[in-house]
Amino acid sequence: ALVNSVTGEEDRLETVLPLVKKYGAAVVAISNDETGISQDPDVRFAVAKKIVERAADYGIPACDIVVDPLVMPIGAINQAGVQVMRLVHRLRTELKVNTTCGASNVSFGLPERNGINAGFLTMAMASGMTSAITNPLHAEVVRAIMSADVMMGHDPDCARWIRKFREVPAMGADGEMGRGRRDTSNRRRRES
């Protein structure tokens, strides 16, 4: 099970974390507290660290915590992309937690959002993001995620990529498969 969610607010920590422990669930940790959502990534890291430490007090391991670092809109905050990439990297390397990002948050208010979201996803994955909240029906987003998997070595032998994008030879007028470079069996037989 995955509990959605706990924040750094004391009353939420006291209510949610015992339930997470009782049921052996994982939990989404939102990087805000009583002061709200900070634009400062160091503050959001500190809130996440507080949640992870409190969860440890209940015996909840870091690997069962999925931190949402709260992606800010790049159209409003110029450095939002750089900040969240650094924050995701810190969460993964220093706190050893999983992360999730609302991919479309970064492109809020901008045109051609899918292009921005696709770029964001590949960079966030390279920074250590382990999951994302995104639309799996947008081809550009799917292609970006799959290409990042290839580049990061998460798609051995590019098998998923090839399976998804390899073109099937077209049928000829006679109903037989087209004779591309790969289909040499008939030619060899004829030459013998």
Q: What do the predicted segments below correspond to?
A:
Residues 9, 154, 173-181:
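Intrinsically disordered, low-complexity regions
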Residues 22-172:
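Catalytic alpha/beta core domains of metabolic enzymes, predominantly
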Residues 176-192:
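Terminal or standalone catalytic/regulatory effector modules within metabolic enzymes
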Residues 1-10, 79-80:
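Catalytic beta/alpha-barrel core
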Residues 11-17, 37-40:
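Short, charged, surface-exposed secondary-structure boundary motifs
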Residues 8-14, 73-76:
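Short N-terminal helix-initiation segments at or just after the protein's N-terminus
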